[in-house]
């Protein structure tokens, strides 16, 4: 079980060579967060990985805040595309 990084990048890139835009970073973090969330359904006591999950959630939150501040339209389309609350 792992994230298909190339597929996530392909689905969210803004240009042909784009791998580091906030949209791509948020999409990759979202995919990893969803994967870890499923992991915790069976491994309830895995607190070490839970800390990593919280770090990813916080990083995604800061990237989303940055994107919202820079370009609100891109922010709105991204959260709608990824199905995030807000």
From Swiss-Prot:
Gene Ontology biological process terms from the UniProt entry: translation
UniProtKB keywords: Ribonucleoprotein, Ribosomal protein, RNA-binding, rRNA-binding
Entry GO CC: cytosolic small ribosomal subunit
Spans annotated as Disordered: 1-22
Residue stretches of biased makeup (Basic and acidic residues): 7-16
MF annotations from Gene Ontology: rRNA binding; structural constituent of ribosome
SUPFAM superfamilies in UniProt: S15/NS1 RNA-binding domain
InterPro entries to which the protein is assigned, alphabetical: Ribosomal_uS15, Ribosomal_uS15_bac-type, uS15_NS1_RNA-bd_sf
Keyword Cytoplasm: no
Quaternary data: Part of the 30S ribosomal subunit. Forms a bridge to the 50S subunit in the 70S ribosome, contacting the 23S rRNA.
Family: Belongs to the universal ribosomal protein uS15 family.
Function: One of the primary rRNA binding proteins, it binds directly to 16S rRNA where it helps nucleate assembly of the platform of the 30S subunit by binding and bridging several RNA helices of the 16S rRNA. Forms an intersubunit bridge (bridge B4) with the 23S rRNA of the 50S subunit in the ribosome.
Name recorded for this polypeptide: Small ribosomal subunit protein uS15
Organism: Xanthomonas oryzae pv. oryzae (strain KACC10331 / KXO85)
């Amino acid at each position: 079980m792992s994230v298909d990084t190339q597929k996530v990048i392909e689905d969210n890139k803004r240009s042909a060579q784009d791998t580091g835009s906030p949209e791509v970073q948020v999409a990759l973090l979202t995919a990893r967060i969803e994967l870890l969330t499923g992991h915790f359904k069976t491994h309830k006591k895995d607190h070490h990985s839970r800390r990593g999950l919280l770090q990813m959630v916080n990083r995604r939150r800061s990237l989303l805040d940055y994107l919202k501040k820079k370009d609100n339209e891109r922010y709105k389309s991204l959260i709608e595309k990824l199905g995030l609350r807000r």
